[in-house]
C-alpha cells in the first residue's frame, strides 16, 4: 500500500527519475520481442526506436482541451497541407547532437507531426507555437497496443502579491499521462511538463509556474485531492503556487491515498501536516436556526407590556355628526400607511378609514382623484389646530364638460371646470345650507389664484389620530431592549422622562395616565420562539443571515494557514467588546473658532480648515481702463505726450498711448484767436482737418462751442482754452491674478473634547474619547471652488468663487474660463472696444447720472489762480471688458469661502451614567414670531443662560436643549400669548408677535382644491406613476450603481473561488 506521508517536490523528482529508468528498461526488453507491423512514426530522441511504427491517427490519439470550452486546440498541431492532400508523412530529421552548455539551453527536437522545430530559447513556452513544440514529446507509460486511459485535466492556481487579489488558473494534463523527455545528463526538463489543456495563461504566469522551488510551505487536502503550497520569488515579485499532487503512488502501487476525513484546528501540528476540509454545512444550519430565532425575537417577539393595574383609558371626546354623501370610495394605491391619517373618520352614521376619505398628510401631499359630493361642490383639505378637516366649497356651478385632473405630489394646482368660476362672497353671513359647522373664508396657498371671498363650509368630520402602538428594539440582538413608539396619539399623554413621546422615540420606559409601558423579554420569550417559526419571519431570517454565513465561510476557507482558525476564533469571540453607553446628551456648538460648550465634557472648536485637490489654472493680467488729460489755457501746437509734458504726467501718458484701442480727443473751447492772430471757427472743422495741417497731432480735434471757458478766469472773452483727454485699455504692471481650482473640497472641523484633539468631517463625523463617543452633525461640504489670488501693488489677497463656472453659459467670458499662462503675461478675453471720450460742462445736468459702459467724461475745473485750470475725469463701466476686470472678480466672489448656515449638533454618548448640568435661570430676550394652532412652526429665538444646557419650555411644552448663548429654533405653538419660557427653573415672559386664528373658522393651510371632474375616486397605477415620476427616476438611477456593485461582488466571488476551493 502507498504511504500516507504527503509527497513533496523532492519526492516527485525522484519518482519521475525512477519512472524514466523503468521506461527505458521496459523499452529495451521489448525490443527483442516480435511486434505487429505498423506504419512508421517519427519518434523523439529520448525514446526507443522500436516504437517508430506507432499509428498517430488511431483511437489513442491525445485529446486536448476536453470540456474546457476553448476555441483553439494547442495540444495538437495540424498536419501540413501536403500531408493532408497526399496522405504521407515526412522523413524524420537527423537527431542533432547537444553539447552541455554553461547555461542549459533546450535542444532542437521533433514535434511528432513531421519535421522538426527549435525548442524555446527563452525557457518555458510562452506562446502557442512553443507550447505545441513542448507538447509533442509525450511517450506513453503503458503498452502502445492497448488503449490509453481517459485523459484528465487538473487545475493549479497561482497568485502574486504584486498584482493584488488576481488568481491565475492553469489547467494541464497530469504527469502520469506521459513521461517527460530526458536530457543527456539523465535529468528531466521541467519546462516540458507544462502541458496545458485549457486557455493559455500570460507569459509571466507561465514563467512563474515553471519556476523551480524546493520548499513546500504546506500540504492541503480536500476529499481525495492533495495540493502542495509553495511561495517563491520571480524577478523580485513574490508568487504563491498551489500544485495538484498525484492521487496514486508513483512507486507502481495503485492504491489511492486515504481520504482526508479528520480536521485538525490546533495551532501546532505534531507529525502530520495540518489538513482542512473546506465546507461548513453544520455551522450554516445551526447559524440559520439561531438567526431565525433572533430575527423573530427582534421583529415581533418582544411585545411591549402595559401595566394593567393603571387607570383605564380616558373616554374619547364626542364627535359631531356631519352630512353624509353616499358615494363609494376606493382606497388609493399609495395610501393606508401608518402615519398621521392611519385612524378612523366618522361621517354621519358610518365609520370609514382615513385612507379612504382623507388624502395624504398636509406636509407630504400625494393625494389623487376623489370626490365626496356631486358636481356642485369642490373638495378641499383644511389643516388647522394640528388636524386635517374635510371641507366642501358650496354653491359652485357645475362644469360644462368634465376635465381630467392632473395630480402630482405636493401640488396644489388642480383642474378647473370649463365654466366661469363662482362669484365671490362678500361677507360671512351666507348660509352653508344644511352643514352643521361654521363657515369661513378660504385662504389658498397658491398666489396666482385670484378667486377671493368664497365660503368653505366644513363638515363636522374630525380626523382621529391613530391609536398608540409600541415596538421593541435591541442592539446586536442582546439586552437591554428599548421601547420604540410607532404611532402616538397626543391625548394618550405618553411621556419619556417628562418629554412627550413622538413616533420614533426610543425609551426604556414610557409613562402616561394609562400606566407604564416597557418591553419585558421574559413574558414574550415563548411568543418570540413561536413567531420565529412562521413563514415570514423564517424568510426574513434567511435573507438577513445568508450574507453573514457566506462571510464566515469565506473567512474560514481563505484562512488556511496553520493556526488561522484558532486565531480567528480568538478574535471573534474574545476581541469583541459590545458598546455600553450610560447616557446621551445633545447640544449645539457655534461655528466660530474658539466656541465652547458642555455636553457633559467641555467641547471647544479649535479651528476649521479645508482640504481639497488643487489644479493650477494659470495666471493672467487683468485689463485696466486708464485715462488722463490736461486743461490748458491756450491751444498747443504739439498735441502729444511729448508736447504736453508740462501738463500731462509722462509715465501714465506713455502707458495709455501704447495701450489697446486708444481714444484721444482734443477740444478747443471758444477758439477765436491764438498767438496774436485771429482764426475762424472753420479752422477746426470738419474734424480738425485744417488744424492738423499746421499742427501735428494724432488725436481727434473738435471745437467745443457753448462750453464755458471760466476755468481760465481773468481774461477777455476772446481768450481760448483747450482740453486734451487720452484713454485706453492697458495691462496694469502691478496687477496679476492667479487661478486655482479646488475639487473634492471637504471641511475639517478641529475639535477639542476634554483636552483630546479630534478632527471630524462629513465622511467621519465621530470622535472616540475616553469619556465616550461624540457624534457631530456637520454641515455638507461646500463642493468645488475657484480661488483667485490677486496681487495688486504688492498687496496679495484671495477671493473665492463657489461652484464650478458655467463656461458654456453666461460665464464664457469670465477669467476662470480662459486659458492663462504661468508667467502672468497674458491678458484675458477679447480686445475691449474703444473708449468714448465726452466733454461735459461743470453745470451740465448729465453729471447727475453715471457714465455709460466704456465712456469717459471730462469736465474742466476752475483753477486756484489765473491761467490755471484742472480736469475732472469720470470713467464708466468697462463695457465689453467688464468680466476681465478686477471689479468683476470682486462682484462674483467672496472673501469668506464658505460659512455654515447654522451651529454644529453634538450628540455625546457617555460610557457611564453622568448627571448632565442643567441651567435653572430663565432665558433672556426670547422672541416668538409666527402663529399658533395653524400647523406651521413659529420662530423662537433668544439667549440661553450659563450653568449648563437650557431645556427650553414654552408654556410648559418642551422645545429643545440649547447650550449657553444665542439660540434660534422653530416650534409648533398650541397656546395663545402670553408665553412663559423657562429652562427648568424660574420662568420669564417672552415677547410675541403671533397671528390670532380665533376670528376665522378655517385658517392656516388650505390646499388641494379639487373639482368634480371625475366620476369616481379610483386612481390608476399609471396616474400614480405620473405623479411620482421623480421618485421612480431616482430609484432607477440608484438601481444602476447597485446593479454594478452586485456585478462587481459576483465577479469578485467568481475569481475568489480559486483561493477558497481550488479544483
UniProtKB/Swiss-Prot annotation:
Q: Spans of biased composition, class Basic and acidic residues?
A: 70-87
Q: Transmembrane segments in this chain: where?
A: 535-555, 1029-1049
Query: Mind listing the GO biological process terms from this record?
Result: clathrin-dependent endocytosis of virus by host cell; fusion of virus membrane with host endosome membrane; virion attachment to host cell
What the record says about its domains? Structural polyprotein: Contains two internal signal peptides that are necessary for directing translocation of the glycoproteins into the lumen of the endoplasmic reticulum.
UniProt keyword annotations, A-Z: Calcium, Capsid protein, Clathrin-mediated endocytosis of virus by host, Disulfide bond, Fusion of virus membrane with host endosomal membrane, Fusion of virus membrane with host membrane, Glycoprotein, Host cytoplasm, Host Golgi apparatus, Host membrane, Host mitochondrion, Host-virus interaction, Lipoprotein, Membrane, Metal-binding, Palmitate, Phosphoprotein, RNA-binding, T=4 icosahedral capsid protein, Transmembrane, Transmembrane helix, Viral attachment to host cell, Viral envelope protein, Viral penetration into host cytoplasm, Virion, Virus endocytosis by host, Virus entry into host cell
Gene3D superfamilies named among the record's database cross-references: Rubella membrane glycoprotein E1, domain 1, Rubella membrane glycoprotein E1, domain 2, Rubella membrane glycoprotein E1, domain 3, Rubella virus capsid protein
Where do the record's region annotations for Human C1QBP/SF2P32-binding lie? 30-69
Write the protein's name.
Answer: Structural polyprotein
Sites binding Ca(2+) sit at 670-671, 718-719
Site, as annotated: Cleavage: 300-301, 582-583
Entry annotated with the keyword Transmembrane: yes
Q: Which residues lie on this side of the membrane: Extracellular?
A: 301-534, 583-1028, 1050-1063
Region annotated Functions as E2 signal peptide, chain positions: 279-300
Species: Rubella virus (strain Cendehill) (RUBV)
Miscellaneous notes:
Structural polyprotein: Translated from a subgenomic RNA synthesized during togaviruses replication.
Where Phosphoserine occurs, the residues are 46
- Keyword Transmembrane appears in the UniProt entry: yes
The disulfide bridges present are: 153-197, 590-595, 619-824, 641-653, 699-712, 758-767, 807-817, 931-934, 950-983
Q: Which GO terms describe its cellular component?
A: host cell Golgi membrane; host cell mitochondrion; membrane; T=4 icosahedral viral capsid; viral envelope; viral nucleocapsid; virion membrane
Q: How is it modified after translation?
A: Structural polyprotein: Specific enzymatic cleavages in vivo yield mature proteins. Two signal peptidase-mediated cleavages within the polyprotein produce the structural proteins capsid, E2, and E1. The E2 signal peptide remains attached to the C-terminus of the capsid protein after cleavage by the signal peptidase. Another signal peptide at E2 C-terminus directs E1 to the ER, with a similar mechanism.
| Sugar-bearing residue positions | 353, 371, 429, 658, 791, 1011-1012
Which residue stretches does the UniProt record annotate as biased composition, category Pro residues? Answer: 93-107
Region: Disordered, residue numbers: 1-131
Molecular function GO labels:
metal ion binding; RNA binding
Amino acid at each position: 500500500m502507498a504511504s500516507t506521508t504527503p509527497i513533496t517536490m523532492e519526492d516527485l523528482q525522484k519518482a519521475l527519475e525512477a519512472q524514466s529508468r523503468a521506461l527505458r528498461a521496459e523499452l529495451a526488453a521489448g525490443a527483442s520481442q516480435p511486434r505487429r507491423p505498423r506504419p512508421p512514426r517519427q519518434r523523439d530522441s529520448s525514446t526507443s526506436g522500436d516504437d517508430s511504427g506507432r499509428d498517430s491517427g488511431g483511437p489513442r490519439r491525445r485529446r486536448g482541451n476536453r470540456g474546457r470550452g476553448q476555441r483553439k486546440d494547442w495540444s495538437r498541431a495540424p498536419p501540413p497541407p501536403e500531408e493532408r492532400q497526399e496522405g504521407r508523412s515526412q522523413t524524420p530529421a537527423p537527431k542533432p547532437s547537444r553539447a552541455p552548455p554553461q547555461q542549459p539551453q533546450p535542444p532542437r527536437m521533433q514535434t511528432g507531426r513531421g519535421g522538426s522545430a527549435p525548442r524555446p530559447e527563452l525557457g518555458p513556452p510562452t506562446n502557442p507555437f512553443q507550447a505545441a513544440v513542448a507538447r509533442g514529446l509525450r511517450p506513453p507509460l503503458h503498452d502502445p497496443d492497448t488503449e490509453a486511459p481517459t485523459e484528465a485535466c487538473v487545475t493549479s492556481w497561482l497568485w502574486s502579491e504584486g498584482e493584488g487579489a488576481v488568481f491565475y488558473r492553469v489547467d494541464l494534463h497530469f504527469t502520469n499521462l506521459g513521461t517527460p523527455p530526458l536530457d543527456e545528463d539523465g535529468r528531466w526538463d521541467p519546462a516540458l511538463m507544462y502541458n496545458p489543456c485549457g486557455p493559455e495563461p500570460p507569459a509571466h504566469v507561465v514563467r512563474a509556474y515553471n519556476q523551480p522551488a524546493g520548499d513546500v510551505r504546506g500540504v492541503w487536502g480536500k476529499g481525495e485531492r492533495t495540493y502542495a503550497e509553495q511561495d517563491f520569488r520571480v524577478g523580485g515579485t513574490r508568487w504563491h503556487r498551489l500544485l495538484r499532487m498525484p492521487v496514486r503512488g508513483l512507486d507502481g502501487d495503485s492504491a489511492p491515498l486515504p481520504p482526508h476525513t479528520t480536521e485538525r484546528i490546533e495551532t501546532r501540528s505534531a507529525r502530520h501536516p495540518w489538513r482542512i476540509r473546506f465546507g461548513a454545512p453544520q455551522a450554516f444550519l445551526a447559524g440559520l436556526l439561531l438567526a431565525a430565532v433572533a430575527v423573530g425575537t427582534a421583529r415581533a417577539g418582544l411585545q411591549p407590556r402595559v401595566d394593567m393595574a393603571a387607570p383605564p383609558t380616558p373616554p374619547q371626546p364626542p364627535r359631531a355628526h356631519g352630512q353624509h354623501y353616499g358615494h363609494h370610495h376606493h382606497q388609493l394605491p399609495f395610501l393606508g400607511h401608518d402615519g398621521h391619517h392611519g385612524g378612523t373618520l366618522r361621517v354621519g352614521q358610518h365609520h370609514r378609514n382615513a385612507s379612504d376619505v382623507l388624502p395624504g398628510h398636509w406636509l407630504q401631499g400625494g393625494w389623487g382623484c376623489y370626490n365626496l359630493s356631486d358636481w356642485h361642490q369642490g373638495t378641499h383639505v383644511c389643516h388647522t389646530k394640528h388636524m386635517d378637516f374635510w371641507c366642501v366649497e358650496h354653491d359652485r356651478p357645475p362644469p360644462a364638460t368634465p376635465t381630467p385632473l392632473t395630480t402630482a405630489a405636493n401640488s396644489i394646482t388642480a383642474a378647473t371646470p370649463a365654466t366661469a368660476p363662482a362669484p365671490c362672497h362678500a361677507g360671512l353671513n351666507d348660509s352653508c345650507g344644511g352643514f352643521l359647522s361654521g363657515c369661513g373664508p378660504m385662504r389658498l396657498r397658491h398666489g396666482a389664484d385670484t378667486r377671493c371671498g368664497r365660503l368653505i363650509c366644513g363638515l363636522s368630520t374630525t380626523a382621529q389620530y391613530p391609536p398608540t402602538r409600541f415596538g421593541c428594539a435591541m442592539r446586536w440582538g442582546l439586552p437591554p431592549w428599548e421601547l420604540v413608539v410607532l404611532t402616538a396619539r397626543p391625548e394618550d399623554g405618553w411621556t419619556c422622562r417628562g418629554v412627550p413621546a413622538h413616533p420614533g422615540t426610543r425609551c426604556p420606559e414610557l409613562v402616561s395616565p394609562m400606566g407604564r409601558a416597557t418591553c419585558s423579554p421574559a413574558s414574550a420569550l415563548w411568543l418570540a420562539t413561536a413567531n420565529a417559526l412562521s413563514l415570514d419571519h423564517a424568510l426574513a431570517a434567511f435573507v438577513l443571515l445568508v450574507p453573514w454565513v457566506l462571510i464566515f465561510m469565506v473567512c474560514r476557507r481563505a484562512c488556511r494557514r496553520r493556526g488561522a482558525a484558532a486565531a480567528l476564533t480568538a478574535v471573534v469571540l474574545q476581541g469583541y467588546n459590545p458598546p455600553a453607553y450610560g447616557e446621551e446628551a445633545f447640544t449645539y456648538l457655534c461655528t466660530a473658532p474658539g466656541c465652547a460648550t458642555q455636553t457633559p465634557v467641555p467641547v471647544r472648536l479649535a479651528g476649521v480648515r479645508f482640504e481639497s485637490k488643487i489644479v493650477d489654472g494659470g495666471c493672467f493680467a487683468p485689463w485696466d481702463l486708464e485715462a488722463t488729460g490736461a486743461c490748458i489755457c491756450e491751444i498747443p501746437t504739439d498735441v502729444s505726450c511729448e508736447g504736453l509734458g508740462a501738463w500731462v504726467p509722462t509715465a501714465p501718458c506713455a502707458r495709455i498711448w501704447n495701450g489697446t484701442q486708444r481714444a484721444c480727443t482734443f477740444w478747443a473751447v471758444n477758439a477765436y484767436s491764438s498767438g496774436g492772430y485771429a482764426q475762424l471757427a472753420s479752422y477746426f472743422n470738419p474734424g480738425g482737418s485744417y488744424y492738423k495741417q499746421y499742427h501735428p497731432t494724432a488725436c481727434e480735434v473738435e471745437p467745443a462751442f457753448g462750453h464755458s471757458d471760466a476755468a481760465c478766469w481773468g481774461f477777455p472773452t476772446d481768450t481760448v482754452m483747450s482740453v486734451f483727454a487720452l484713454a485706453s485699455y492697458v495691462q496694469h504692471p502691478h496687477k496679476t491674478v492667479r487661478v486655482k481650482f479646488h475639487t473634492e473640497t471637504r471641511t475639517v472641523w478641529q475639535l477639542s473634547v476634554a483636552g483630546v484633539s479630534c478632527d471630524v468631517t462629513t465622511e467621519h463625523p465621530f470622535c472616540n474619547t475616553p469619556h465616550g463617543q461624540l457624534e457631530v452633525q456637520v454641515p455638507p461640504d461646500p463642493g468645488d471652488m475657484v480661488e483667485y489670488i490677486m496681487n495688486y501693488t504688492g498687496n496679495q489677497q484671495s477671493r473665492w468663487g463657489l461652484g464650478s463656472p458655467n463656461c458654456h453659459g453666461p460665464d464664457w467670458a469670465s477669467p476662470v474660463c480662459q486659458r492663462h499662462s504661468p508667467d502672468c503675461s497674458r491678458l484675458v478675453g477679447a480686445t475691449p472696444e474703444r473708449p468714448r471720450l465726452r466733454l461735459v460742462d461743470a453745470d451740465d445736468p448729465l453729471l447727475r447720472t453715471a457714465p455709460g459702459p466704456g465712456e469717459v467724461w471730462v469736465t474742466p475745473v476752475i483753477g486756484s489762480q489765473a491761467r490755471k485750470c484742472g480736469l475732472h475725469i469720470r470713467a464708466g463701466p468697462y463695457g465689453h471688458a467688464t468680466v476681465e476686470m478686477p471689479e468683476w472678480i470682486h462682484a462674483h466672489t467672496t472673501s469668506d469661502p464658505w460659512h455654515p448656515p447654522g451651529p454644529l449638533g453634538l450628540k455625546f454618548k457617555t460610557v457611564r451614567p453622568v448627571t448632565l448640568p442643567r441651567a435653572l435661570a430663565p432665558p433672556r430676550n426670547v422672541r416668538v414670531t409666527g402663529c399658533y394652532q395653524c400647523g406651521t412652526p413659529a420662530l423662537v429665538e433668544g439667549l440661553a443662560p450659563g450653568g449648563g444646557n437650557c431645556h427650553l419650555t414654552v408654556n410648559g411644552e418642551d422645545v429643545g436643549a440649547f447650550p449657553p448663548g444665542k439660540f434660534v429654533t422653530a416650534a409648533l405653538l398650541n397656546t395663545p400669548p402670553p408665553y412663559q419660557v423657562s429652562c427648568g427653573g424660574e420662568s420669564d415672559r417672552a415677547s410675541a408677535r403671533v397671528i390670532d386664528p380665533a376670528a376665522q373658522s378655517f385658517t392656516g393651510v388650505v390646499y388641494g382644491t379639487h373639482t368634480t371632474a371625475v366620476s369616481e375616486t379610483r386612481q390608476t397605477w399609471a396616474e400614480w406613476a405620473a405623479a411620482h415620476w421623480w421618485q421612480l427616476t431616482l430609484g432607477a438611477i440608484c438601481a444602476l450603481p447597485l446593479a454594478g456593485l452586485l456585478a462587481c461582488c459576483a465577479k469578485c466571488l467568481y475569481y475568489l473561488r480559486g483561493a477558497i476551493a481550488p479544483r
